[in-house]
Amino acid sequence: MTRRTRSGAAAVLAVLACALPAGSAQAAYHDNVAQATIEQDGGRAFDFAWDIAKQRGGVVDQANKAHAAARCTGCEATAIAFQIVLVSGSPSRVAPTNEAVALNLECAQCEVVAEARQFVRVVDRRVRITSAGRRELADVRATLQALEAQDPPIDQLYLAVEAQEARVRQVLNTELVSRSDPSEEPDPIDAQLAQDTDQG
């Protein structure tokens, strides 16, 4: 899920102002939240949140949130949140949420970007990510974190996030194995995949 605003996007405020009070973000213990708020002219705020959650059964209600807000002149706010949820067994309810909110609060010549990507896999047995998959995800995380220093234009930032999203999908499609299998060879778990939910 993507939310982007530039200067002059005050119309968004009327719809979303209540979603992100200045300086606050409500998060449950298993939520993944990136929040970037800037109120300094010419300033820049960047926040990146990354989470890999695993659970057996129960209620799958993890939330992945990217909140960005700016109230200044010539400033930038960028929030990026990536969350992977691996669920084994038979959950009683599957209702994850993915949310991207970008607020331009009477901001002149500013850019506000929120990017949220959530990946949920429900399988009938316990699985793990192979060593190769973990290395790939570690590189995805580092690549996304590096965007803070690179500070690319909005269009390039979006393409970078999309590219990393594709890499995560590839890992989840090819690098999940049964936890009982000592081999590092990926299992064909398609037959056991009960639910495949990606939001972003």
Segments and roles (model prediction):
Residues M1-V12:
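Bacterial N-terminal signal peptides that target proteins for export
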Residues A11-L20:
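Bacterial N-terminal signal peptides
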Residues A27-G200:
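Low-complexity repeat regions of mature extracellularly deployed or surface/particle-associated proteins
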